[in-house]
Design a protein with these regions (language model features):
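Phosphate-binding loop of NTP-binding sites
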Residues: 7, 87-146
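N-terminal leader/targeting and accessory segments in enzymes
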Residues: 1-91
Length: 146
């Protein structure tokens, strides 16, 4: 997928570089970046992803999504400046994987008593009917059988 297609899903402040390059994957962990990666620099509680941009470029990243303008380099890499890297990552990942949430049906269970029982019964019913199902509750979390 081309950078320009992928970033069409996010709010961009500024672009420096060629957006016509092919992206092989999206990474937010600098240790997993390889040739063709788009690296998303996120500010965390223990580390700042912006500190790893140079390392990612050296490993072959073709694009970097970042919040801090001072980290934009001179390399032949596309830098995409955004206000919120976390939000940009979520939107790009959603698009990258074919917008899966648009294909999902969601059932919410609210009330005072019986929510877990009702949700579990619905999970088992839909599973028996052959649907791919998930269950998120305060007791268990399942995606299909796992």
């Amino acid at each position: 997928m081309k950078i320009q297609e992928l970033i069409g899903t996010i709010e961009v402040v500024r672009i420096v570089g060629d957006t016509n390059k092919e992206v092989t994957d999206i990474q937010f962990d600098s240790r997993r970046v390889g040739e063709g990666s788009l690296f998303v620099a996120q500010v965390g509680t223990a580390a700042d992803g912006h500190e790893y941009i140079a390392q990612c470029v050296a490993k072959g990243a073709v694009a970097v999504v970042l919040e801090k303008e001072e980290y934009i380099g001179e390399e032949d890499v596309c830098y995409i400046l955004v206000k919120n890297s976390d939000e940009a990552l979520g939107k790009m990942a959603h698009y990258w994987y074919g917008e899966p949430s648009k294909k999902m049906k969601l059932v919410g269970v609210t009330g005072t008593n019986g929510k877990t029982t009702t949700a579990t019964l619905l999970y088992k019913l839909f599973k028996e009917l052959g649907y791919q199902v998930g269950l998120l509750s305060t007791v268990v979390n399942y995606v299909d059988d796992e």
